[in-house]
Amino acid sequence: MPAVKIGIIGAGSAVFSLRLVSDLCKTPGLSGSTVTLMDIDEERLDAVLTIAKKYVEEVGADLKFEKTTSVDEAIADADFVINTAMVGGHTYLEKVRRISEKYGYYRGIDAQEFNMVSDYYTFSNYNQLKYFVDIARKIERLSPKAWYSAAANPVFEGTTLVTRTVPIKAVGFCHGHYGVMEIIEKLGLERKQVDWQVAGVNHGIWLNRFRYNGEDAYPLLPRWISEKSKDWKPENPFNDQLSPAAIDMYKFYGVMPIGDTVRNASWRYHRDLETKKRWYGEPWGGADSEIGWKWYQDTLGKVTDITKKVAKFIKENPALKLSDLGSVLGKDLSEKQFVLEVEKILDPEKKSGEQHISFHDALLNDNRSRFVINIPNKGIIQGIDDDVVVEVPAVVDRDGIHPEKIDPPLPERVVKYYLRPRIMRMEMALEAFLTGDIRIIKEVLYRDPRTKSDEQVEKVIEEILSLPENEEMRKNYLKK
């Protein structure tokens, strides 16, 4: 059983990092491994490290920890590098969004047809794209045999960029495919009897195969829609898998959009707050409305505060067990949710649902498993270029990644009317980044239904480029 080094970049993301640590503890084949936690926010990093060590101590696992603020130290001699970092954080994203809305671009210039997710910036996110390439080049130099796992958005643009420009082993991960499980549950099906397959691009995947006990299960959907969809209400802003938007997309494309694909719809569903509420449900209007996104940001802030609070309490009370947190934390909903998350990771029988550690285990220890991953197409999906990264199921073992045959193929409408337009915007974002041709970003906005004049385009781009953190971006785009 090989002990490995796993570097986690952006490890101050508490819940994500703790999920990975818990999965490592539940993976015997990776026992004895070293986890290097890297983040530029030392306070958050220390808090995560404290809780992670406490967890490992309680479950009796053999894991070693290192912490660092240096990307190089996280990467050096690593076998796997997981990147979840967002350059500039949500503060930068909101700066760009405010400037964009000042000039008439509701929810920001990066909110585009088929890319409405609020932290999935592609055109104003030069620093994030550059960070992806910088990390990949450091891996090439410091740990050329390591696998790079992309978890930070934009996964589609980022993983395509890295696989095209740096010769390392790279793969992207997302949670979106778990939307299939909600459909299975709502239809009252036994999960083990369902044969499903999804395919597309990150945040643009579709349920191409849906069979139950060997029979086509799609006929069950219209019945649910006619009998129960009228009673649907979202439990939180992200609960949209069976929303009116999802059902409307299904009726047009012929297959169900899965996970974040429901959010990444056309402007028909996103024109304004009232439109969003109609398609994604009251009271939030989905995760990407101004209300839904504030809910998400507030939740993130609370989780950060709770993480620090728990870490402080552990240091002051070393005899405390994580299983006792329920008696320590208050009755606030966010604290209750944090306790539930801890209870999940303490369950020795269940992994977190994050795919990274199981993927590594499959490669190292030949524990053959099925994943939904982001890899270069290379003929997997018909009608898409080979060097475009697609999100598809694959079996992974010691011999590598074995993509499944997409059967049945995606409907032509999905490929022609959804995937190709989304891919076009990805190509425009990457060409703009790589060439420094600002005209490409302008062209995107000239085509934008929110644009009323060329002057509007010039002003919004100029103000975004003038942000202090965008000095390098400005030099890149104004060098010609």
Swiss-Prot record:
Molecular function terms, GO-annotated: alpha-1,4-glucosidase activity; metal ion binding; oxidoreductase activity, acting on the CH-OH group of donors, NAD or NADP as acceptor
Chain positions recorded as NAD(+) binding sites: 4-70
Record-annotated active site: 175, 260
BP GO terms, sorted: carbohydrate metabolic process
Residues binding Mn(2+), per UniProt: 174, 203
Organism superkingdom: Bacteria
UniProt entry tagged with the keyword Hydrolase: yes
pH dependence: Optimum pH is 7.5.
Keyword list, A-Z: Carbohydrate metabolism, Glycosidase, Hydrolase, Manganese, Metal-binding, NAD
Binding site for substrate: 119, 153
Enzyme class of the recorded protein, top EC level: hydrolase
Record PANTHER family: 6-PHOSPHO-BETA-GLUCOSIDASE-RELATED, ALPHA-GLUCOSIDASE
Family membership: Belongs to the glycosyl hydrolase 4 family.
Self-association and partners: Homodimer.
Protein name in the entry: Alpha-glucosidase
Organism of provenance: Thermotoga neapolitana
